[in-house]
Amino acid sequence: MELFASDQGRGVALVAKADGEPVGTCLLAESEIEPNHDVSPWLAGLFVVPEHRRKGAGAVLVRAIEDQARQRGFSRLYLYTTEAVEFYARLGWTVVDHTNWKGFDTALMVRDLSQPGADKENAA
């Protein structure tokens, strides 16, 4: 799997490719539009095409965004998720709050970037 980055100052867009075809994306963003928690930066927009899910692409993208945040001097990274709490927990993320966003129970999660990652084999 190859990763391609578009660096936009404090933000980064990553694209994962397999056999030359895009299979996933993820962003490092300075802020999230909603719901509103006053923290930064954010892992946002993680998406893997269905036929490449559960093959490790999501974990590779998350780890790459974590590395990008570390390189920019951040000690923590945040995200919102409605359905993938267990996935992120396997990667070392922790739920710190819940909010109701448009009728969905949404978890605010944090990753302490000074801590090593969780078991990568269980993350896929």
Where are these regions (language model features)?
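Active-site rim helix/loop that mediates acceptor-substrate recognition in acyltransferases
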Residues: 1-13, 23
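Short coil/loop residues immediately preceding or within conserved phosphate-binding loops
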Residues: 11, 38, 43, 104
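Conserved beta-strand in the GNAT
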Residues: 13-15, 21-31, 42, 47
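Conserved active-site tyrosine of GNAT-family acetyltransferases
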Residues: 88, 93
